[in-house]
Swiss-Prot record:
Sulfotransferase that utilizes 3'-phospho-5'-adenylyl sulfate (PAPS) as sulfonate donor. It holds the Pfam family Sulfotransfer_1. It comes from Arabidopsis thaliana (Mouse-ear cress). Belongs to the sulfotransferase 1 family. This is Cytosolic sulfotransferase 11. Keywords: Cytoplasm, Transferase. 3'-phosphoadenylyl sulfate binds at residues 98-103, 184, 192, 250, 316-318.
Length: 351
């Protein structure tokens, strides 16, 4: 039986592999948030004082208040904290990358705006635009590249998205602002992230790189990580302020979608009426927002989102348990033991 610290010691790989990747990384396609070309002098000075590490591809990450960021991402997070002033009626969807973000963006948008598009389903925005263009990211889009957007031009309620920790987000928001958090088990999040990075960088990485990413995950060194700290921040927030933070599990939405969508609507204070339920409104939203439907739309097969990422990159299987096709039994066991240790007696359990 491995102890937790023994597990971690097994996770460290030779940095020679990372150095090798460093020499070839310039060939990879990079989104803006992974770069370091939009950082103020003040933030550059801050970065020099922060703990640093490298991700599994050799790109520098910096730990600010317990969370890992690329330089451009850190700059955007700081700008969000300084300038973002949401209205009490606005909604924020929070998640880790590849934790169910795309699906929840579509569900929240469809639930909140269902009355507006009830009579014209054939022209519903979700049929014509990628969910990420309908629900913009705060730090990845709106406040990226040192932009300070004019949020007053958006109608209420506006739906925003973020990958920030709850503590980082709370520096910019009031508790009155509704926050929906969706999370996914670490094993499927990891595997989905692996495929995402392959598609994002337009390359096919080898097994050695897969193992490097696994090691980084085990150490918590990933964008917005560690995974467990991110999840726990919102879990505890939902326990402390249930009326303002809704904690949702991807697996539960897959298992009982109707129940969870109704729960979502009630939290957002736009519950389905008896007439809506009887007329099949919930089922219509689930059909519209199904990953199968969204992934087959032309706009999501060939389009490009405003953040410069191909739309198809955000769609793959969306299945629960796909990790079994990629992780070795020892890898799966290591993840399970780390999560058991890190979540401890928090009350948060993943099946």
């Amino acid at each position: 039986m491995f102890t937790f610290f023994t597990i971690l010691s097994l996770c460290f790989k030779s940095w020679e592999q990372i150095i090798t990747m460093e020499a070839s990384k310039e060939a990879h396609h990079l989104p803006n948030y992974m770069k370091d070309d939009n950082v103020s002098q003040e933030t550059k000075n801050l970065i020099t004082s922060l703990p640093s590490d490298k991700d599994f591809m050799g790109y520098g990450l910096y730990n600010y208040k317990g969370c890992w960021y690329y330089p451009n991402t850190l700059q955007a997070v700081l700008d969000v904290q300084k300038h973002f002033k949401p209205r009490d009626t606005d909604i924020i969807l929070a998640s880790l990358p590849k934790g169910g973000t795309t699906w929840l963006k579509s569900l929240i948008f469809a639930v909140v705006h269902r009355e507006k598009y009830r009579g014209t389903p054939q022209t519903h925005p979700l049929l014509l635009q990628n969910p990420h263009d309908l629900v913009p990211f705060l730090e990845v889009e709106l406040y990226a590249n040192s932009q300070i957007p004019d949020l007053a031009k958006y109608s209420s309620p506006m739906i925003f998205s973020t990958h920030m920790h709850l503590q980082a987000l709370r520096e910019a928001t009031t508790k009155a602002c509704k926050t929906v958090y969706v999370c996914r088990g670490i094993k499927d999040t990891f595997v989905s992230g692996w495929h995402y990075r392959n598609m994002l960088h337009r390359t096919k990485m080898d097994q050695a790189t897969f193992e490097l990413m696994f090691d980084a995950y085990c150490r918590g060194v990933l964008l917005y990580g560690p995974y467990w700290e991110h999840v726990l921040s919102y879990w505890k927030g939902s326990l402390e302020a249930k009326e303002n933070v809704l904690f949702m599990k991807y697996e539960e939405i897959i298992e009982e979608p109707r129940v969870q969508v109704k729960r979502l609507a009630e939290f957002l204070e736009c519950p389905f009426t008896k007439e809506e339920e009887e007329s099949g409104s919930v089922e219509e939203i689930l059909k519209l927002c199904s990953l199968r439907n969204l992934s087959n739309l032309e706009v999501n097969k060939n389009g490009t989102t405003r953040i410069g990422v191909d739309s198809q990159v955000f769609f793959r299987k969306g299945e629960v348990g796909d990790w079994k096709n990629h992780l070795t039994p020892q890898m799966a066991k290591t993840f399970d033991e780390i999560i058991d240790y890190r979540l401890g007696d928090s009350g948060l359990i993943f099946q």
